[in-house]
Amino acid sequence: MVMRVCIPTAGTGSRLKGLTKYVNKSLVGLDNRPILSHLIEQFPPDAEFVIALGHKGHLVRDFLELAYPNRTFLYSQVDPFEGEGSGLGLSLLKCKEHLQQPFIFISCDTLVREPIPPPEKNWMGYAEVDDLTQYRTMLVEKGAVVDICEKTLGRIPTHKAYIGLAGIKDYEIFWKAMEEGGKQAIDSGEAHGQRAFIGRGIDAHAFTWFDTGNPPALEKARTAYEKSGGPNILEKTNEAIWFVDGQVIKFSDDQTFIANRAKRAALLKGFVPEITGVKSNMYRYAEVEGRVMSDVVTVPLFEKLLQHCQTFWSEEPKSDQDKVSFKNGCMKFYKDKTFERVDLFFKNFEKKDGTESINGVSMPTVKTVLDNLDWNWIADGLPRRFHGDLHFENILWSGKKQVFTFLDWRQDFAGSLTTGDVYYDLAKLMHGLIVCHELIAQDMYQVKWEDKAIHFDLHRKQMLVECERFFESWIVKNGYDLAKVRTLTALIYLNIAALHHYPYSLLLFGLGKSMLANEKK
């Protein structure tokens, strides 16, 4: 018989706080893919999965269909999934019709290292922990479960922490207990049905367990599962890039963002990967052979990349967009968006626009700095085909094929899918040379924001410093305006500060403001 596995994902994941604002708790990232991927891949390829859907359930379904088109999933909608009448027991009862056979139950925040045995017997999984108070426990005698206790009732060493993983062989007995259990069954979940097995035999199985259901435990799991040499992706709450089974899946909470990304992939054909699947909040493409430029860059290779970019930028826009409308778009994209993002930064991080010195240098308010910029000069862009987020972490180099591939292209430029400003791409390249994503991911920076002073410092790679020097001379040699590139680079830091995690956000703001003030001098 094919193994059937029940994974309830209906809950809101409130213990994870802001991490589940935009995604279901099973889609929270761990080792550059959702926790749910780690669960799915613990089971044989022919296993069938019964998924209880609730909070942001459409995202769970869409992800599974994109990531695992050759696996079998059965879905049950849970309503209500929060508030009065909700509970894990309700999620299970909604799945009953698909679980009329022995099955595995696994919580969507449970990861284990060991192979998971089939439900040839009734069994419950446990792990050794130092503090039992926050877990349901089971009393184990001679390898068998003789009692199941609610939180705070277990005692070391006789009781073991139940980890939300179990084999249900006697499913008919289980379902009878769940249906007759009323509110207690709804609240207790699978444990209510499992209590019906006591006296009939429940094996206790030990596992190396990683809980991902609360922030401290999730952090431990992320550390344990982290692989060296992985991609350097700076975390955002409303976006993600997942690597699953040779595929790359891009998520955003913004459906227009995803739709336009997919449309632009066709416009950038030959420079970016081909999109192979699209859902409302995600798209998929095959993983591309190569290494990110930040890992392999040398000055000669950087020069080769810039030659490739010149070819990319050489295409004139096909639309009839005139210079005035393009400049208006640049004004909206640069000026209006900057003021909006600065306000968002102050709101997100509870800061005010002040005159704090930055690294010992006196500073006016950021509003003063922005008001004094020559926005007409900044908005006088160069309309061409564009990438929109062109930095080394978004560029792959295949030494074998001698080919560059651009990744994570921007969805639009001031509403246009076809035409952007070459200066923005140049500034994006510059911003990645100054701030190395790899070193930021390793927390190799410092920032301190006090009442009257901001201090920051960051590590840089010598090769990127050399590339920056070369880039500045290349910009001038090829007829571009270096001052404009550096001014836009500073604006980029100010713009993205609102979108990144604390305290990196403070570093970006301090760097952007100080760089902008210095460029103005």
Question: PLM features: what roles do these ranges have?
Answer:
Residues 412-473, 490-504:
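Active-site activation/catalytic loop segments of kinase-like enzymes and analogous catalytic loops
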Residues 234-262, 281-296:
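ATP-binding glycine-rich loop module of kinase domains
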Residues 266-272, 293-358, 363-380, 477:
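Conserved kinase catalytic-core helix
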Residues 13, 254, 280-315, 339-355, ...:
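A glycine-centered beta->alpha junction motif in the catalytic cores
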Residues 2-7, 15, 29, 33-103:
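Conserved N-terminal catalytic core of the sugar/cofactor nucleotidyltransferase
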Residues 111-185:
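Conserved core of the sugar-phosphate nucleotidyltransferase
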